[in-house]
């Protein structure tokens, strides 16, 4: 049986992962794909939540994280992701798990809640930013996490609700193609995202005008989420969770070495250009 999840307190120091996870580096039987997360309050309190069917299990945690990533509300962080930062810049996003307590008792006029309804639930309200081993005070919202997944090409499909003709409309957005490149334009570093998505709405949209309207709304939502997380992570917190530094090192290795001690400053000046195409079906 493999170790499936490691949960930390928010005050954890992750600046020396080789020491913190020495047991994993030495033990070939430890699965490097183990999920990492932070507890909203304390890891001990989270792991000791009592259920009528027993104590909270690792399967509960991994399922919550996997579904969170699939639904575009958080960013996955595995042990191998952290270990890869041992000799590289450490910019990480990590799910924060909290306990959602059941609502208060019903009034006498209501039926009593079932045992399952009274169970505490695990939920992901936000995603932490970790920079050089420190968990920052700024967190990613669900929209930010979605933008990060689209920007890095890790989003497969995503369900969202957009306002269409004055009414809410459910939309399923699936990735069709993705590319992220870094260019030097007259001394300006520009990160170019080219993204094509397929959108399927809950309404039967057949005419071209309506299709174009929905496509424009989906494109606007994606641009807002992507630009929002770029500004929050890279500009406001100097935390490159998009691996732009890898693009910089690969394409401009000499400049990377030259500015290695000023990498945060360089990355904080990179501009983002988005080219998003949406096709509605």
Regions found by a protein language model. Give the residues of each.
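A glycine-rich, acidic short-motif signal
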Residues: 1-281
